[in-house]
Amino acid sequence: MRIISYREELKQQIIDLILHIQNEEAKINLPLQQQPDLLDIRDFYISRGGEFLVAIENGVVIGTIAFMNYGDHNAVLKKFFVQAEYRSQGIGLALYKKLLGVLVEQGYKKILLDTPAVTVKSHHFYEKAGFKMISKQELPFHYEYPDRDSLLYLLVL
C-alpha cells in the first residue's frame, strides 16, 4: 500500500469508493450532486491550499483523506474513507498521520470535521486522535455541510 497525492486518473475510483461507503454501508443517502468537491477535487482542495491523499493497493484506490483550507490556520478534515476489507489494518491511521503531518508542517491550528452519527467506529478513531466533540454553536469558524444527523469534532494543534 502506498499513499499519494490526488491524481486526476483516480477520480472515478475515488468517487465510486466514497459513494459506496456513504450510501451502501452507512446509508446516509448523500448523492454526488450534493458533493461538488468530488467532481472537481483539484479546484476544491489542491488549488485552494488543501490536500487530497489517496491510499493505493495494486493500482486500486482503497482509501482517501483530505482537508480544505478555511484560512487563518483553520482546516476541515474531509473524505476520510477506507474500503471495508482494508479496515483495521492501519490504513486509516497511515492516511491520517500523513495528512496530520502536512497540516502541522503548514502551520494549521484548528482542524474541524463533521461525521454522520451512525458511523460510531469513526467517532472512536477521532476521539482517540485527540478530537473533541463540539456543538454547532461552538464552531470556531463559519462552516456549512450537508447535515446527515452529523456530529462535529475539533482538534486544536
Predicted features and spans:
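Conserved glycine-rich acetyl-CoA-binding loop
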Residues: 60, 83-97, 104-106, 111, ...
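C-terminal "cap" of GNAT-fold acetyltransferases
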Residues: 6, 109, 116-120, 124-157
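Extreme N-terminal starter segment of soluble prokaryotic enzymes
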Residues: 1-2
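Short, conserved glycine- and acidic-residue-centered signature motifs
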Residues: 34, 92, 146
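Acetyl-CoA-dependent GNAT
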Residues: 5-79, 83-84, 96-98, 102, ...
